[in-house]
UniProtKB/Swiss-Prot annotation:
Ligand binding (Mg(2+)): 934, 947
BP-aspect Gene Ontology terms: cell morphogenesis; filamentous growth of a unicellular organism; negative regulation of G2/M transition of mitotic cell cycle; negative regulation of G2/MI transition of meiotic cell cycle; single-species biofilm formation
PANTHER family given in the database record: EUKARYOTIC TRANSLATION INITIATION FACTOR 2-ALPHA KINASE EIF2-ALPHA KINASE -RELATED (PTHR11042), MITOSIS INHIBITOR PROTEIN KINASE SWE1 (PTHR11042:SF196)
Subcellular location: Bud neck; Nucleus
Organism: Candida albicans (strain SC5314 / ATCC MYA-2876)
Identification of the protein by name: Mitosis inhibitor protein kinase SWE1
Comp. bias regions, Gly residues: 1047-1061
One term of GO molecular function: protein serine/threonine kinase activity
Active site: 929
Gene: SWE1
Catalyzed reaction equations: L-seryl-[protein] + ATP = O-phospho-L-seryl-[protein] + ADP + H(+); L-threonyl-[protein] + ATP = O-phospho-L-threonyl-[protein] + ADP + H(+)
Biased composition (Low complexity): 388-413, 591-601, 1037-1046
Sorted UniProt keywords: ATP-binding, Kinase, Magnesium, Metal-binding, Nucleotide-binding, Nucleus, Phosphoprotein, Serine/threonine-protein kinase, Transferase
Protein family (similarity comment): Belongs to the protein kinase superfamily. Ser/Thr protein kinase family. WEE1 subfamily.
Length: 1178
């Protein structure tokens, strides 16, 4: 036992090469050469058979044989690099005096460049028995010198011999095995080894099996030939001896990619992670050829066409010793992670062929967690194993790998169905079949870290929904001595349960959002959005300190309007019965003479009244939140109604409010609603307020004219001017700001005392549609315009991205004034606004010469918004133009989005916009921002182009000129090539017509956006309207001329090809009810099949004749016959990607369709004249 490295029961001996990275031992081995020669370490494992056991030597074969071509199939590229590994074998087993080297050439496909040992990447074959030697046990250490070996250290290149690298595996079946507990300590690394014994009933004479025994002094030293593995793609890579690697050497098989990986050594500094726990051990075949199978993720895994041998997947107890291999792709945490799962174990090749009689499926564990679904106990029995436990000396060499194999193997008579543990939830997960020898387990090195703690008898906490992992189940099944399992050790080693559902890849997985997007263009009528854009409600917890009502205190009889001893709130619905008001928007009308009793409850049953005056808990869906901010809703004096006037206007009334909060900035918290009783205007009712001694008392006066105006007079002892004059901070109190427009008061109105507080009026946020709403929002107020034109003549209209629009009444004529949102200080900003003003002066200004104006009118100037004047004030620029009462085309389309506009109006819209563009282009100008929001509608329904903010004069001389309009309507050449031509406006107009005709929402990005700019209009559907059906829809009595047979059919066809439309339009299908007599069905012929073809054809022809008789004779042909598709063809030309392929405005206006519509129409573009237009003049 002392001299033989390994001895079985029969007495046969064989040497097992072991790794030795000790520099001291290296000097002993390489003393003759005076250089450090690293020795490669391997385990030559033998199997014990019950009947007879004999050792088979691993014979060497030349790599240049047909077998190599069988494996590689000549499919590997020559760019794959060769890894040259050399093994030194000592002939003398006692003193390790002699050393022989075996050079092995192995190709590695990935272009790795690694400077250290690849975590015991033992991708080399096992040595023959004749070349092996043993080393003293004391020489084996765990130290690994990074500089102990190099390619240049080999002095005898002739001693290097090639060894076989590829062979066929024939795995053996072992049905039962036992587990002997083992200890893995970091101090002395004492390992208890287990023996695997095969059942006598299943002998296989083809190969013998031996028990693995590693004696105390039976360690051979094999060092790696090179620590610097040059794996870069270099065709000139040379071997150690200086020779070039032959091109035909490609010793990697596609069928050998997936094999259990178990490193032999983890002593390298690079290998921070431990080797795998489980290593598959497969018996050698008759040829005893050394084999390895390297997992790889880049090499194609398709089966070799010339493969004739069948491979069985190695089981956890019958895998080949050659399976103790590591791929360069499986590096530690400090290694190279060139792939997504570079730190994971090997994947299983799909090219592996299983034996038909023993079908197996490989189940692997990836990562650091293992999920075991259930344990299975086979029906057959197993023979007890003959245990052989030997204690090698203290070392942490490759012996620990065997310990990991034996100590963590599954227990006997149990099989675990292990899931493929992938990180990504998108990968397939397949369960393995129940077979005792079909498990190949790959695990990371962290399992070994806590391996010594897995035999504890203490219960290990696991999630109740997760079963035990394989290694834990095995150790729990045992009853052995070991260290105590601690939670910290378990957490440091590896997660002991499958926690993939809690991993980031599962927690943050989201569906592909584009899958929920529309596959095409969205119809406007398919979007159901609320018509009113409401403001968010106020925070309910923000209470006004001055408006809190105390319902527990009795109101003193300060006013005759209150009953004595009554609570302020009275009944829940009686709060306003105490408030005499002239003009209040309450849920029910309140009689000022009504007393406080329960009879008034029914007057306020429509809403729940808040106990806090100034807030409303109920919101009306038909009005905005602004209208519901308070029940104390006061209208302007112009909206007073006689029935709402108080019967006793001369009587002073007081309403009591209690507030327990001192009106002091140091006490009252800083809330947005803090200053609620600040100056404002326009109230026509009195709201008397009573407060305690700490809070101010608000009194109310009556003007001399007898009309009650709410005025707040605070007690001068408790209130100060500073508290009232401070500006508010929320929209509710914006009307109380300093800039509120109020008439100046004279001294008589203020009172004789100059220190008295001015009586002010209160207005609680009038609605946006009220005439005086300008005074509510400071952003909608312009002091300069008010001073210039008067407050009554200025009205806020709306705002855009860069400007605010006002309506101005000047000399009894309305104008529109556009003001910049912000003061323009920068040079570029001023140039932009000046360029717009210049364009307006050139294009739309009214000339002094009347003849010139008339000529320009005929050329299309009338379809542009007229320019009046422009000026600046305090860096704000004002542009005064013509006012269009009809709003914008965008608003018009929104109002009519629920049905399709008739084609005649579409042609009218196209003609009017083209006339305006023709005039713009004739002046060598480009609009570049044409969209419905910039097209205005006059009172007569005509269209006018406005907003020349991006208008540019041609030619463009600026090198860095870059102007882009709305991305929904922008032409593609403006983005890609910066080509500014008049055809860019034609493209924008084509998209406007497409939007109107198809009733769609133009996309602003994505695939539909790109398709529209590539000439693909397939998503839009048909653009030409079915004017016949629309004509019949708007003429409900015309169906009386239809025969009864046609009406009984319930559906029919117009007879024209495509004249009935298709399902892509909203106006092609109308239900027909023979009983109602006011509607008609015009369905496509496909939907009209209800009987025999002859009957349907007869009914369709009769219906077609009757319908054609209803069409007026003067109707344009292109509107009657739906197969003409004139509008579709025109839009396709306008939206061509090449700008020079598009027609000009003049060319489109010269089309016959445009000429016919222009001659027939009598109204503006937005006025409906019928599906076929107005009849011609007699």
């Amino acid at each position: 036992m002392d001299s033989n490295p390994c001895q079985d029961v029969s007495g046969d001996t064989s040497s097992t090469p072991m790794a030795n990275n000790n520099p001291t031992n290296d000097s002993t081995i390489s003393s003759q050469n005076h250089s450090k020669i690293g020795l490669r370490k391997h385990q030559q494992q033998h199997y014990h058979q019950h009947s007879h056991s004999q050792m088979h030597s691993h014979s060497q074969q030349s790599p240049y044989i047909n077998q190599l071509e069988y494996f590689t199939n000549n499919q590997f590229s020559r760019s794959f690099n060769s890894l040259i590994l050399e093994d030194a074998n000592d002939a003398n087993t006692n003193n390790s005096s002699t050393t022989t080297l075996n050079k092995k050439t192995i190709n590695k496909s990935p272009p790795f460049n690694i400077k250290q040992d690849l975590l015991n990447d033992s991708i080399d074959t096992f040595l023959d028995n004749s070349n092996t030697e043993t080393i003293e046990d004391g020489d084996v250490t765990t130290t690994d010198d990074d500089h102990d070996f190099d390619d240049e250290d080999i002095e005898d290149p002739e001693a290097v011999q090639y060894t076989p690298t590829l062979n066929i595996l024939k795995s053996k079946k072992v049905d039962s095995f036992d587990i002997i507990s083992s200890k893995h300590r970091k101090s002395n690394s004492q390992i208890t080894y287990n023996s695997h014994v095969r059942k006598p009933s299943e002998e296989d004479t083809s190969s013998s099996m031996a028990t693995i025994r590693l004696s105390n002094n039976s360690q051979s030293s094999i060092k790696r030939s090179s620590k610097y593995l040059n794996l870069s793609i270099d065709s000139n890579l040379k071997t150690v001896d200086g020779g070039k690697i032959p091109d035909e050497i490609d010793d990697i098989s596609l069928n050998e990619i997936d094999v259990a990986v178990a490193p032999n050594d983890f002593s390298s500094p690079l290998s921070a992670r431990k080797p795998d726990i489980f290593a598959a051990i497969t018996a050698a075949n008759g040829n005893s050829n050394n084999q390895f199978k390297r997992p790889h993720k880049l090499v194609s895994q398709s089966p070799s066409p010339s493969s004739k041998n069948k491979f069985r997947i190695s089981s956890s107890t019958t895998s080949s010793p050659q399976s103790n291999l590591h791929s360069p792709s499986k590096l530690g945490s400090k290694g190279f992670k060139m792939f997504k799962n570079a730190n994971r174990d090997a994947i299983m090749s799909s090219s592996r062929v299983m034996t038909p009689e023993k079908p197996k499926m490989v189940s692997k564990i990836f990562g650091k967690s293992a999920k075991i679904r259930r344990a299975y106990t086979p029906t057959h029995t197993s023979t007890p194993m003959a245990v052989s436990s030997l204690n090698p000396p203290s070392s942490s060499t490759s012996n620990s790998t065997t310990a990991a194999i034996t100590s963590t193997s599954p227990p006997a008579n149990e099989h675990y169905d292990i899931d493929n543990d992938f990180d990504s939830p998108s990968k397939n997960r397949k369960s393995s079949n129940i077979s005792a020898s079909s498990i190949i387990i790959y695990q990371d090195e962290n399992h070994i870290k806590s391996n010594h703690a897995r035999k504890s008898s203490n219960p290990i906490p696991y999630p109740p929904t997760e079963p035990l992992p394989t290694n834990i189940s095995a150790s729990v099944a045992e009853t052995g001595k070991g260290s105590t399992t601690t939670k910290s050790n378990l957490s440091k080693g590896c997660p002991l349960f499958d926690d993939k559902e809690n991993k980031a890849s599962y927690q943050f997985v989201k569906p592909l959002q584009t899958a929920f997007n529309s596959s095409g263009l969205v119809k406007k009528n398919s979007i159901s959005g609320s018509s009113d854009r409401k403001l968010p409600p106020e925070t309910p917890i923000k209470r006004n300190p001055l408006m809190i009502l105390n319902t527990n205190k009795v109101v003193p009889p300060y006013s005759s309007g209150f009953a004595e001893g009554k609570d302020v709130m009275g009944d829940q619905h009686d709060i306003y019965s105490h408030i005499p008001c002239q003009n209040q928007r309450f849920p029910g009308s309140v009689n000022p003479n009504t007393t406080t009793n329960n009879n008034n409850t029914q007057q306020h049953h429509d809403s729940d009244l808040s106990i806090e005056v100034g807030r409303n808990n109920s919101y009306d869906a038909s009005s905005s939140t602004i209208n519901n901010t308070s029940y104390i809703k006061i209208f302007p004096s112009s909206e007073l109604k006689k029935e709402q006037v108080l019967q006793r206007p001369q009587e002073d009334l007081e309403l009591v409010f209690n507030s327990d909060i001192e009106l002091d900035d140091n006490i009252i918290p800083e809330t947005p609603t803090k200053k609620s009783l600040l100056p404002n205007q326009h109230h026509q009712h009195h709201l008397p307020l009573y407060t305690q001694s700490k809070s101010p008392l608000l009194k109310f006066d009556t003007e001399k004219d007898g009309r009650r105006n709410l005025s707040i007079v605070l007690d001068k002892s408790n209130a100060t001017k500073r508290e009232i004059s401070e500006p508010p901070s929320t929209p509710i109190n914006m009307s109380f700001a300093k800039n509120s427009f109020k008439k100046p008061m004279n001294n008589a109105e203020r009172g004789d005392d100059p220190d008295s507080i001015i009586a002010q009026r209160i207005d609680i946020m009038p609605s946006l549609d009220e005439a005086d709403s300008v005074s509510v929002y400071p952003s909608k107020i312009d002091e300069h315009l008010i001073e210039k034109f008067g407050m009554k003549n200025i009205k806020y209209i709306g705002s855009g991205a860069f400007s605010i629009a006002f309506e101005c009444l000047f000399n009894n004529e309305k104008f529109a004034i556009k003001r910049t949102k912000k003061p323009l200080i920068g040079k570029l900003e001023k140039q932009t606004i000046k360029r717009e003003i210049e364009a307006l002066r050139v294009l739309t200004s009214i000339k002094e010469d009347e003849a010139t104006n008339m000529q320009e009118q005929e050329e299309g100037k009338e379809y542009l918004v007229y320019f009046i004047e422009a000026w600046d004030f305090n860096n704000y620029y004002y542009i005064m133009t013509e006012f269009c009462e009809g709003g914008t085309l965008f608003d018009f389309l929104e109002e009519n989005k629920h049905y399709k506009i008739d084609e005649f109006r579409i042609w009218k819209i196209l003609i009017e916009i083209l006339n305006g563009l023709k005039f713009i282009h004739s002046k060598n100008y480009l609009h570049l921002d044409l969209k419905p929001a910039n097209i205005f509608i006059t009172f007569e329904g005509s269209l006018k182009i406005g907003d020349f903010g991006l208008a540019t004069k041609l030619p463009i001389l600026e090198k860095d000129f870059d102007l882009e309009g709305d991305r929904n309507y922008i032409a593609p050449e403006l983005i890609n090539d910066k080509i500014y031509t008049p055809f860019a406006d034609i493209f924008s107009l084509g998209l406007i017509i497409l939007e109107i005709a198809a009733n769609i929402i133009l996309p602003d990005n994505g695939t539909p956006w790109r398709k529209l700019r590539s000439g693909d209009l397939s998503d839009a559907g048909r653009l030409s309207s079915d004017n016949i059906s629309m004509f019949l829809q708007h003429n409900p009595n015309t169906n009386s001329n239809i025969s009864g047979s046609g009406s009984r059919s319930g559906s029919g066809s117009t007879g024209g090809n495509g004249s009935a439309g298709d399902g892509s339009t909203n106006s092609t299908n109308f239900s027909y009810n023979s009983l109602s007599g006011n509607s008609l069905t015009l369905n496509p012929p496909v939907k009209a099949v209800h009987g025999t073809s002859d009957t349907n054809n007869t009914l369709a022809s009769e219906l077609s004749k009757n319908i054609e008789g209803l069409i007026p004779s003067w109707a344009p042909d292109f509107l009657v016959h739906g197969d003409s598709m004139n509008l579709d063809k025109l839009v396709n030309k306008m939206l061509r990607p090449n700008p020079f392929d598009r027609p000009s405005a003049c060319n489109i206006l010269e089309m016959p369709e445009c000429l016919i519509v222009e001659n027939r129409r009598k109204c503006g573009a937005t006025i409906f004249e019928g599906e076929f237009g107005s009849p011609p003049d007699e």
